């Protein structure tokens, strides 16, 4: 009775549920971008569009990392390469695990469907769920008020196979309708597929290299990888300090600033605050994306980031133009024009991703 009071659209045959008031959700790419920008803010350098092609290893130590943009001579290498972690381990002469890719497809529903549910739910106990490879996905009310449905879990030999198949979407909806019968594919506004990077042991590998001493592996990370990321980072930082301290003094940065100023979100402001922003910068008053109410000013803020990715998708993941019902049908040409003007290049040179 309490469950249906909180979530009236849940299956009326539900017999019990577990309430966890400490659970929640974040925007995964927004969080990652925030961490990256804060790292740069504190002195880190990020090399985008840079692929590791090989390594030189001598006497149990990586002496050089060769990339498509030159050669690095690192004191320490952290292998967090996802589905390619075993390749990096092989280059470093420290491979003791294998990655078997596992594809997962999720659907994003229109914001109007967000009113159907306000929590995180995953059905347990059915034959359909017992055959899954992991927790089995679920229904999530996102921080942007959409519903996310999925993912599924399908073994694949292709590490970059992010294709989306109709049968995956159908399977996910069939399973999650057990929880919420009101779910309908008609509310889907987009869908996507990611590839997990599990090991055959189905466990995280967070440890120092076994043969190569200036190496830390952070591999085999899958769900709940996002949840554990802050704790994993603390462990890896401790390992890194321990390894580096053998050759040099290591001290905490006394000027470290853990606060990263974010981009103002005008659609979440009250009228008075929004008017004040527009008065200071008229670009905040020019709405580019009607679905998400994203202004020209917010797009320019994204392009001025210290981790700037001046592409349509780069801007999309920072301030959300193109993430609404029309999926960029209206605003994409304007976003391309703003990027081109910012970079001082022709429209034809602006990339999608």
Q: What function would you assign to each model-found segment?
A:
Residues 238, 245, 347-353:
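Iron-sulfur (Fe-S) cluster-binding modules
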Residues 160, 295-306, 329-347:
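Iron-sulfur (Fe-S) cluster-binding segments and ferredoxin-like electron-carrier domains
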Residues 34, 134, 143-144, 155-287, ...:
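C-terminal catalytic lobe of FAD-dependent flavoproteins
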Residues 48-50, 189-190:
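Short loop/edge segments at beta-strand edges and connector loops
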